[in-house]
């Protein structure tokens, strides 16, 4: 039984209105300040994922009118494209996604969305398990955004976030959690 819907665009609110579901704000809302949290609370959202572009101090300082979560692990979306680069290059896998490789050899996973609107992911996952600051930001939840991981990798990541003595793996990013947006 479905109990909640995640909306990543304010245009989704009328679609889920009246369905009797809890409405949760997803990463696509790009919630960047306390006024946005207040507005989303007034619009009836139950919780919100804050922007991945916020520094940890900014997340901490938000007035949390509604419960907040942040992505603390995972490949963050870089862009959603109207035209599918996989289909255009003859690599379409019927919705199973693929990979774009840049001139440096970095591999960017492509997740296929509804209506063949692919989401291009960062080549490196965000990793904060070994950094205590995210635990002091007043978040209700921490989200592990598992997209391309195998079951074994997902279990390892979960154990890293539940434990206290796990060094960072190779090939990760801290995202904008420490440097923010310029």
Model feature map: region roles:
Residues 1-39, 43-182:
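Active-site pocket-lining/capping segments in soluble small-molecule metabolic enzymes
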């Amino acid at each position: 039984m479905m109990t909640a819907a995640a909306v990543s665009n304010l245009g989704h609110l009328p679609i889920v209105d009246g369905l009797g579901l809890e409405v949760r704000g997803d990463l696509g809302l790009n919630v960047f300040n306390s006024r946005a949290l207040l507005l989303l609370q007034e619009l009836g959202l139950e919780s919100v994922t804050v922007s991945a572009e916020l520094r940890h101090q900014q997340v901490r300082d938000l007035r949390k009118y509604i419960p907040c979560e942040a992505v603390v692990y995972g490949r963050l979306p870089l862009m959603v494209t109207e035209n599918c680069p996989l289909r255009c290059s003859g690599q379409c896998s019927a919705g199973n996604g693929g990979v774009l490789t840049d001139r440096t050899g970095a591999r960017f996973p492509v997740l296929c969305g509804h209506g063949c609107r692919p989401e291009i992911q960062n080549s490196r996952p965000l990793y904060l398990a070994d950094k205590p600051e995210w635990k002091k930001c007043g978040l209700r939840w921490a989200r592990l955004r598992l997209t391309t991981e195998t079951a074994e990798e997902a279990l390892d990541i979960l154990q890293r976030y539940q434990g206290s003595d796990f060094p960072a793996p190779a090939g990760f990013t801290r995202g904008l959690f420490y440097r923010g947006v310029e």
